[in-house]
A protein has these predicted regions:
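Extended, low-polarity segments enriched in aliphatic/aromatic residues
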Residues: 1-162
Length: 162
């Protein structure tokens, strides 16, 4: 909606999808709720649960061109990590956890936002490639919530194929 000639989020009808924030290339729209990223992550898990509930599903993740911001950001920077691989699972939560774990063990790409942050002596190191690239990322809370609501489990067995 509009107030005083500016676009604002109407919290009464907002579904929490974050699409408006991601679509704005100028960061002109921001949620006034400091927990917005955590709420968005929970909503993504809940929407995934609604789609998958009671249906047989199989999930594939191509872990490549890992950008510092959400893929929906039009102004994204160069990849922060090298291509990690292709992952597949019947369990979407286990799949995402396996992908995250692989990314956490990957070496940052040179001259990326992540490597620049890590080289900055004033940067607070999180020892997490995603948080060290963007401290607003809430991947852990999203996966914890997904597991809590029964979407899947964060436990997995990694079988490597060559």
């Amino acid at each position: 909606t509009y107030e005083n000639g500016k676009a604002v989020i109407n919290q009464d009808i907002c579904k929490g999808c974050g699409r408006c924030i991601g679509a704005c290339a100028f960061d002109a729209i921001e949620n006034q709720n400091w927990n917005a990223n955590e709420i968005l992550g929970r909503k993504m898990a809940e929407y995934s649960q609604a789609v998958c509930d009671g249906r047989p599903t199989f999930h594939i993740s191509l872990v490549r061109d890992i950008s510092p911001n959400c893929d929906c950001h039009g102004e994204n920077d160069a990849p922060i990590l090298p291509d990690v691989g292709i992952f597949a699972s019947f369990d979407p939560v286990a799949l995402d956890q396996a992908c995250v774990d692989a990314c956490l063990h990957a070496t940052p790409m040179p001259n990326s936002q992540l490597s620049d942050n890590l080289a900055d002596p004033h940067w607070h190191h999180h020892h997490d490639n995603f948080l060290d690239s963007n401290p607003n990322v809430r991947w852990k809370e999203t996966l914890e919530h997904a597991e809590k609501i029964g979407l899947g489990t964060r436990e997995y067995e990694l079988i490597q194929m060559k």
